[in-house]
Amino acid sequence: MGIVIGIDVGGSTTKIVGVEDKKIKNPMFVKATDPVTSLFGAFGKYIYDNNISLSNIEKVILTGVGSAYIDQPLYGLPTAKTDEFLANGLGAQYNTGLDSLLVVSMGTGTSFVKVQGSTIEHIGGLGIGGGTILGLSKLLLKTHDFHQIASLAEHGSLNDIDLHIRDITPHPLPGLPLDVTASIFGKADAN
C-alpha cells in the first residue's frame, strides 16, 4: 500500500495531508490566488517537503469547492473526488473516536455537519468565516495578510470593541453572566 494524499481545495486556502498505514502525515496549508494554482502548488510542495515520489502515491482524493476545477488525474495518478461534508464528518469521527457529534468546520464560510454512526449529514452553515475576517480586515485595516491581522488582534482588546452584558445592565441576566458578549462591534462607534 502506498500513500493516499487528501487535498481540500478551499475558497481561500488549500489543505493537504498524506495518510500512510492509517497514520496522518504532516498536514500543510497553502494559499494562492486561484484554486488550480493552489492545488498544484500544495501538491508539489507537499511531496517535495516530505520526500515523497509519485511512484509511492497510491491515490489522490480531492474535495472542497475548488476541486470542481479539476477534471483529470493529477500527474497520471488515480484521482477521485469526495463530498466535503462527508470528508469533514469522517475526519472528525476518526480524530475524536466519537460515534455521534456535530462538526463545525470554519473555512471561508462555516458549515455544520451532523454525524450519527455511519450517517453524515450537512445540516446548515453560515456565510461567516475566514473570508469574513479577511474581507473586514481589508476594508477596515487595509490589509488581508492573515499574519498581520493576527498580530494586530494580539495587541487589541475585545472589551474595547464588543458590547458586553455588563455594558447594558449591572445585573446578570438568567444564564448570561456580565462578561458575555451582547453585540460584536457594539462599541465600534465609541472608539
Residue positions per predicted region:
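Short glycine-aspartate micro-motif
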Residues: G2-D8, I57-I61, L101-S105, G125
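Short glycine-rich, Thr/Ser-proximal phosphate-binding strand/loop in the N-terminal lobe
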Residues: I3-G41, K45, I120
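A short acidic Gly-Thr/Ser loop motif
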Residues: D8-T13, V65, V104-G109, G127-G130
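Flexible, glycine/proline-enriched loop segments at strand-loop-helix junctions
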Residues: V30, P78, T119-L126, L134-L139
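Phosphate/pyrophosphate-binding loops at sites that engage ATP/ADP/AMP, CoA/4′-phosphopantetheine
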Residues: F43-E58, N191
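Conserved phosphate-binding catalytic cores of ATP/NTP-utilizing and phosphoryl-transfer enzymes
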Residues: I70-V104, T108-T119
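Active-site rim beta-loop-alpha module in soluble metabolic enzymes
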Residues: K138-N191
